[in-house]
């Protein structure tokens, strides 16, 4: 410590190699310079919490009748900011201790004193890392702090530093208790002397602190921290307004979840389900990676969209999570990977799934709306959250051949109404319900009254095969060739061709179509269509194959099996044409056209020119014969 030339002013050297540490804070610790305001407001809130608590037992506190508040004054022309509170203030010793040493904070000492006295503070304090104040040096070269402690015999002091390794303290006249921080902004940060910008930052980070924040004569933080109140004390109207503020969604939420958790971790949360999936999620599901609820520590925003609070498949849930247990890195911008964070995530995930389960049971119509909007995202959890996999499967819903459009069935309901002798859960995947219901592969199941799940969500292609079975019932695509259709009989309306006629016909199909197919076999699944394509036992079904080709364009298509319905009139007519003249060129034209028609049903017909030419040939032949 050295004496300054000014009478009454003393100069001090920073402890803990402050010059290097301040450089670290300014250039490395905070990625957004606006954070300085959040930190200064948080410190002011701490000081107000302290004086409010001390006033309960200490009658000597000066200005005890003054309303507790934080006031910010701007000068856009001089580019200066003044932040003032009427909190507990500091003595000269506290100035040296709290502003002269990094990683030391009056808040931390205050909490320690309360703990030793076994008292509880009715309020929340932050700033336990002792660096928040110094973030102001990101935006200014010099800071002045004028303060007076709340004690009756206290004096006023002025602390000034340019972050160059020293600070000065001098005694001043100050009538009111509390602290006033003033500074001029660096040229590159003059925007922070504009009222709109400061209001923006307050609403973003400090909207829910316990005390009013005035910018000039206007109070900025007017919205209550609803999550801190009891669920029964919050009206639906308040929740809806809070959701609109939080999400910028003009529609009310579909539902909300109010949590207060105490145990190995303590946190409060207010979560919302949007009525519809946001457009950015509808078209870019990858945007889930950057979403998440807002994370607060004691009502101060730490992360706008905290990805660590929820698994990716639940990040469509909006809301706020607030904890006092979360350890932070030296900067509040970065949340540590910690057991506390992992525990919060685990508990939140379980609570949210319970929320969905209760909704499905007690409010099925609301759940149907939810599932229509967010079912695709929920399904992602099947392949990422193995802890809750069975619960996610229980929440899954599907349209089926026995539901109306827009209505759903669960796996449990499907199994309960399976036909006698049915041992498998059948599904059919494609682009839309109309296409699925028109597919030839569905004919047998429709004819027999066997329910088939209709999967038109692109996500289903990836997640359903991974389920393998439900209630010991294997899941099976109706495109597979290895389905046993013989156990219930064909019940064909027309008798099939005898083997002596069908085998030569199938051989001609193989010869005409060539090695682009694996085989041609007689069908037991077709009822009203002449042919269809199916996948081999170990092959991908057509929907999965198309998805894989979109991701890997060079991936070769697997050969399919062509099934031929030898009961169909077209096939019987072909057999008759062969018997009459097996060299008739029209026979091969019809065979090729039938195969291309099957490809068209699959959405895999690439060479449409040949298909149209053959169609014209067949029309010409049909019109000539009349």
Curated annotation (Swiss-Prot):
Q: Subcellular localization, per the record?
A: Cytoplasm
Note down the stretches annotated as region A.
1-332
What the entry lists under Pfam families is as follows: HATPase_c_3 (PF13589), HSP90 (PF00183)
- Report the principal subcellular site: cytoplasm
SUPFAM superfamilies to which the protein is assigned, alphabetical:
ATPase domain of HSP90 chaperone/DNA topoisomerase II/histidine kinase, HSP90 C-terminal domain, Ribosomal protein S5 domain 2-like
Keywords attached to this Swiss-Prot or TrEMBL record, sorted alphabetically, are: ATP-binding, Chaperone, Cytoplasm, Nucleotide-binding, Stress response
What's the protein name?
A: Chaperone protein HtpG
Lineage at the top is: Bacteria, Pseudomonadati, Chlorobiota, Chlorobiia, Chlorobiales
């Amino acid at each position: 410590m050295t004496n300054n030339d000014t009478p009454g002013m003393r100069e001090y050297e920073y402890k803990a190699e402050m010059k290097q540490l301040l450089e670290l804070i300014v250039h490395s610790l905070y990625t957004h310079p606006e954070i300085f305001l959040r930190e200064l407001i948080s410190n002011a809130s701490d000081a107000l919490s302290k004086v409010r608590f001390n006033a309960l037992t200490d009658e000597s506190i000066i200005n005890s009748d003054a309303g507790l508040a934080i006031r910010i004054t701007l000068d856009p022309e001089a580019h200066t900011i003044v932040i003032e509170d009427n909190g507990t203030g500091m003595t000269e010793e506290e100035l040296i201790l709290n502003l002269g040493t990094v990683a030391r904070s009056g808040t931390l000492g205050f909490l320690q004193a309360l703990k030793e006295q076994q008292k509880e503070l009715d309020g929340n304090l932050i700033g336990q890392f002792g660096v928040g104040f110094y973030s102001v040096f990101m935006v200014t070269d010099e800071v002045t702090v004028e303060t007076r402690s709340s004690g009756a015999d206290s004096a006023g002091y002025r602390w000034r530093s340019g972050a160059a390794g020293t600070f000065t303290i001098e005694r001043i006249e100050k009538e009111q208790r509390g602290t006033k921080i003033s500074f001029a902004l660096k040229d590159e940060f003059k925007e922070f002397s504009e009222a709109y910008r400061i209001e923006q930052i307050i609403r973003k980070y400090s909207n829910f602190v316990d005390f009013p924040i005035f910018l000039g004569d206007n109070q900025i933080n007017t919205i209550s921290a609803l999550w801190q109140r009891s669920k029964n004390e919050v009206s639906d109207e308040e929740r809806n307004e809070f959701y609109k503020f939080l999400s910028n969604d003009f529609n009310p939420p579909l539902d909300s979840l109010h949590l207060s958790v105490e145990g190995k971790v303590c946190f409060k949360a207010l979560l919302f389900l949007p009525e519809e999936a946001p457009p950015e999620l509808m078209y870019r599901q990858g945007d889930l990676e950057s979403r998440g609820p807002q994370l607060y520590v004691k009502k101060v925003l730490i992360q706008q969209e905290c990805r660590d609070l929820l698994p990716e498949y639940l990040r469509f849930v909006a809301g706020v999570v607030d904890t006092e247990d979360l350890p932070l890195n030296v900067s509040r911008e970065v949340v540590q990977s910690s057991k506390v964070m992992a525990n919060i995530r685990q508990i939140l995930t379980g609570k949210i799934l319970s929320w969905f389960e209760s909704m499905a049971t007690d409010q099925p119509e609301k759940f149907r709306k939810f599932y229509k909007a967010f079912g695709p995202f929920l399904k992602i959890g099947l392949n990422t959250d193995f802890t809750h996999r069975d619960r996610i499967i229980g929440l899954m819903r599907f349209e089926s051949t026995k539901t109306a459009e827009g209505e759903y069935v669960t796996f449990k309901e499907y199994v309960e109404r399976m036909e006698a002798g049915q041992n498998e859960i059948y599904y059919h995947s494609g682009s839309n319900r109309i296409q699925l219901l028109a597919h030839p592969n569905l004919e047998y199941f429709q004819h027999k009254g066997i329910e088939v799940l209709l999967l038109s969500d692109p996500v289903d292609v990836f997640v359903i095969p991974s389920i393998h079975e439900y209630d010991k019932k294997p899941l099976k695509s109706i495109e597979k060739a290895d389905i046993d259709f013989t156990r219930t009989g064909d019940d064909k309306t027309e008798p099939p061709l005898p083997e002596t006629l069908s085998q030569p016909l199938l051989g001609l199909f193989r010869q005409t179509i060539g090695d682009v197919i694996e085989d041609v076999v007689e069908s037991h699944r077709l009822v009203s269509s002449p042919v269809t394509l199916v996948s081999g036992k170990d092959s991908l079904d057509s929907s999965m194959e198309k998805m894989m080709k979109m991701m890997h364009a060079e991936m070769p298509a697997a050969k399919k099996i062509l099934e031929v319905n030898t009961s169909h009139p077209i096939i019987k007519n072909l057999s008759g044409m062969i018997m009459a003249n097996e060299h008739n060129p029209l026979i091969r034209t019809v065979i090729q056209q039938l195969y291309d028609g099957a490809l068209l049903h699959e959405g895999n017909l690439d060479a449409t020119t040949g298909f149209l030419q053959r169609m014209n040939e067949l029309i010409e032949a049909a019109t000539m014969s009349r």
